[in-house]
A protein has these predicted regions:
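Short, charge/polar-rich alpha-helical segments
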Residues: 1-16
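Short, charge-rich amphipathic interface segments used for partner binding and complex assembly
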Residues: 10, 21, 28, 32-69
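Short amphipathic alpha-helical segments
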Residues: 16, 20-23
Length: 69
């Protein structure tokens, strides 16, 4: 069974890969509308990854896994 932390870490990786793929698609296209669409999608996936990363940090804090410098 997967822990919440593992699930969130997997989502961060997945969303980051989706954002990177959309960025590549945007760069590869000659059509300005297609570029804008893929760029917007990449931004959304990046925001999702950031939110999941924030959730991961909160889970670490709650579980006591975070060490503060």
């Amino acid at each position: 069974m997967m822990t919440a932390k593992e699930y969130v870490e997997g989502k961060v990786k997945s969303y980051t890969r989706l954002a990177e793929r959309c960025r590549r698609e945007a760069e590869a296209s000659d059509d300005i509308v297609v570029r804008a669409e893929y760029s917007a999608r990449a931004n959304v996936w990046e925001m999702c990854a950031e939110e999941m990363d924030n959730a991961r940090e909160m889970l670490q804090e709650e579980s006591g896994e975070v060490t503060y410098a």
